[in-house]
């Protein structure tokens, strides 16, 4: 998924594992 489609914290370099696939 694109970063814009994920929670804003997933856009950060230190995003947690549940953000995997969001870039």
UniProtKB/Swiss-Prot annotation:
Q: Name one GO cellular component term.
A: extracellular region
Give me the disulphide-bonded residues: 3-11, 6-19, 10-22
Keywords from the UniProt entry: Disulfide bond, Knottin, Neurotoxin, Secreted, Toxin
Tissue distribution of the protein: Expressed by the venom duct.
What is its subcellular localisation?
Answer: Secreted
GO function terms (MF aspect): toxin activity
Task: Relay the domain remarks.
Answer: The presence of a 'disulfide through disulfide knot' structurally defines this protein as a knottin. The cysteine framework is VI/VII (C-C-CC-C-C).
Protein function: Causes abnormal twist followed by immobility when injected into C.elegans.
Q: What is this protein called?
A: Augerpeptide hhe7a
Q: Which organism is it from?
A: Hastula hectica (Sea snail)
């Amino acid at each position: 998924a694109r970063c814009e489609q994920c929670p804003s914290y997933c856009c950060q370099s230190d995003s947690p594992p549940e953000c995997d696939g969001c870039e």
